[in-house]
UniProtKB/Swiss-Prot annotation:
It comes from Enterobacter sp. (strain 638). It is an enzyme of class 2 (transferase). This is Ribosomal RNA large subunit methyltransferase G. Specifically methylates the guanine in position 1835 (m2G1835) of 23S rRNA. It catalyses: guanosine(1835) in 23S rRNA + S-adenosyl-L-methionine = N(2)-methylguanosine(1835) in 23S rRNA + S-adenosyl-L-homocysteine + H(+). Its EC number is 2.1.1.174. NCBIfam families: PRK15001.1. The lineage of its organism: Bacteria, Pseudomonadati, Pseudomonadota, Gammaproteobacteria, Enterobacterales.
Length: 378
């Protein structure tokens, strides 16, 4: 829990998933403070748009103005809702949109937290270009180290006149005025051929490693099981290459593709539709926080390439939650397969949760691990 005083309201905020007491991370940063300092409560008119508000600090502070919270993270929506409830603010005070939705016309204020993925920022700026006016106040913020020349050039190219502030508490802001610069259309989705297959993999803006198969996933694909039946899960599916490969190697199995990113789930669905349309009746697609709300003892196997960051912060809390959800939802003798960087030492984490762990394969950077659900405890 962390306390944020600002010119709008005093807030107690927490991260989602919550961090442990040993490595506490707060649910807001100096850039949130800096952004809120720029606004005068009496001067806000027209719709307020807040983009990439990871834990809801901005949306909660501006709740009296009924802001739109826009992003590509279901975890961020859950965090914002939880922080609204915790601060006794009506959840209806904030309207949630994902980044593929149409943005409200003629906003008065747009606050942007710079996302980790530059392609997502470009997609969002192009969407804003369709609705902002020269009178819209557009302010973006991030840690100073995360604002680069390429970031400024993107604002200048898509929206117009762009300036930056001095650093304050290691945060910087970008001020932008819409001047309708001439703009060349850009491809919002990237596609590439998956080596060793006839498949074309399509990737929306915020999909991890959208320009090509990442080396961890490549290593994982080489060691996926081929003797599975029943229901299995591609957990944190991204563009769905793991699930696609599972569908091909396991014709008696069905696959749940799930991710907290709406763009990832949309990419997975598109990739099944275009590469294995005959397998669509063996697929389910879900935007979710890991396997929240999914019934226990359902799946024969869960496969996962877990993240070790949440936006710009390095953390294993998301992976830890994925592992616990996987164990809850596996049948007895069900199997969890993961690929991870060796230095993360997930072997001992899985052994703590499952009581067992086996190394399937390893190279100088990655390891593929398997854990089996052996009993009904935990």
């Amino acid at each position: 829990m962390s306390h944020l005083d600002n010119g709008f309201r005093s807030l107690n905020l927490k991260r989602f998933p919550e961090t442990d007491d040993v490595n506490p991370l707060q649910a807001w940063e100096a850039a949130d403070e800096y952004l809120l300092q720029q606004l005068d409560d009496t001067e806000i008119s027209g719709p307020v748009l807040v983009l990439n508000d990871v834990f809801g600090a901005l949306a909660c502070a501006l709740a009296e103005h009924t802001p739109y919270s826009i992003g590509d993270s279901y975890l961020s929506e859950l965090a914002t809702r939880e922080n609204l409830r915790h601060n006794e603010i009506a959840e209806s005070s904030v309207k949630f949109l994902d980044s593929t939705a149409e943005y409200p016309q003629a906003p008065g204020v747009v606050l942007i937290k710079i996302p980790k993925t530059l392609a997502l920022l470009e997609q969002q700026l192009r969407a804003l270009r369709l609705v902002v006016t020269p009178q819209t106040r557009i302010i973006a913020g991030a840690k100073a180290r995360d604002i680069h020349n390429s970031t400024l050039e993107l604002f200048e190219k898509i929206l117009g006149t762009t300036t930056t502030t001095l650093a304050w508490k290691k945060a910087r802001l970008i001020n932008c005025t819409f001047t309708e610069p001439a703009l060349v259309d850009a491809q919002q989705m990237l596609s590439w051929k998956l080596e060793g297959t006839d498949w074309t993999i399509h990737n929306h803006a915020n999909v991890f490693s959208r320009t090509g198969l990442d080396i961890g996933a490549r290593f994982f694909l080489e060691h996926l099981p081929g003797n599975l039946e029943g229901e299995i899960v591609d957990l944190g599916c991204g563009n769905g290459v793991v699930g696609l490969t599972l569908l091909e190697k396991n014709p008696e199995a069905s696959v749940l593709f799930t991710d907290e990113s709406p763009m990832a789930v949309a990419s997975s669905r598109l990739n099944v539709e275009t590469n294995m349309p005959e397998a669509l009746d063996r697929c389910e697609f879900m935007i979710n926080n890991a396997l929240s709300g999914v019934e226990p003892f359902r799946f024969n196997a869960v496969l996962c390439n877990p993240p070790f960051h949440q936006q710009h912060a390095l953390t294993d809390n998301v992976a830890w939650e994925m592992f616990h959800h996987a164990r809850r939802c596996l049948k007895i003798n069900g199997e969890l397969y993961i690929v991870a960087n060796r230095h993360l030492d997930y072997f001992h984490k899985l052994k703590k949760i499952f009581g067992n762990c086996t190394t399937i394969a390893t190279n100088n950077k990655f390891v593929v691990l398997k854990a089996v659900k052996l009993g009904r405890t935990r």
